[in-house]
């Protein structure tokens, strides 16, 4: 079985899609399944290039309030044909199959079984402008469709009505659980961590406004992993903002944090960072939005608050500081929640889709 994994986003686009693709390909490697990875070009050199092809210069586009690097190059068709001809994949697995010219070129040229995973909860305005009709012929070339959540399924099913199998994102439970703590920040301060791009919809500004408005009767430290933010001062709060960090350092910061704050303003397709926090034994405060509330049950494995409600956010921070038993209950329940969501299990589900699709001689669901 030969797999060609196609990721629409460049590997310098941090976020859920690349996290998913990276972990999937690592599992394919661990399980000795022959595969290659194809992405748009990137300046990042941290990924193993052995079986990694980069095609097409990237452009930063706005998508549902976030930014992503995709290729729109019309000159990649020859390279795509060459990869398909030389590698002869049994399966082409496309992540966000209509996002840019790379996955579209693979669909146009594919003679393989095509599997598509849909990650987005809103997508670009292309569909809303009716361009989804242009993609109808390409859509017919997809044999099996996966969505990472019910939210992602509901979005894409608005434009392409099919049966979607839901296979959620996974988490490296052992990796985050066994990450070492950072001694210099394990003191008497309450460590609150935010992880993600500084896009408006991610809600970092809500957290900052909360910490500026409320004075807590205990010391607080804010850790921001993501964009570097210049001239950020919040009362007497110590701020750590190293920018984007690798997975190992992220795991260490999560292990050293008391609370992960995920104050997104709009619905998310999933929320991998919530699973990572659970694996790292970190309590969670998250917005009560689609995607997040598929993972978090309020007062069970996290606290859910109204989006952009700084009063609720402040109260939740104080609650988790003051009530250690409640905090530990959330952490324990979080550990139970992710028990079956480790990447070993999730990748097995995806591999089973590969095998079943190869054994199915008919094109499914058209």
Residue ranges and their predicted role:
Residues 4, 184-202, 208-212:
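Conserved donor-binding/catalytic core segment of Leloir-type glycosyltransferases
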Residues 7-14, 21, 27-72:
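N-terminal strand-loop element at the rim of the active site
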Residues 41, 151, 170:
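Carbohydrate-associated surface elements
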Residues 125-145, 151, 159:
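Membrane-proximal helix-turn-helix segments that form the acceptor-binding/catalytic region
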Residues 126, 154-157, 170-188, 232:
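Acidic anion/phosphate-binding donor-loop and adjacent secondary structure
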Residues 244, 252-257:
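Short alpha-helical donor nucleotide-sugar binding micro-motif in glycosyltransferases
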Residues 283-286:
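Short hydrophobic beta-strand element within catalytic cores of glycosyltransferases
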Residues 298-299, 303-310, 319-324, 339:
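Conserved acidic donor-binding segment of nucleotide-sugar-dependent glycosyltransferases
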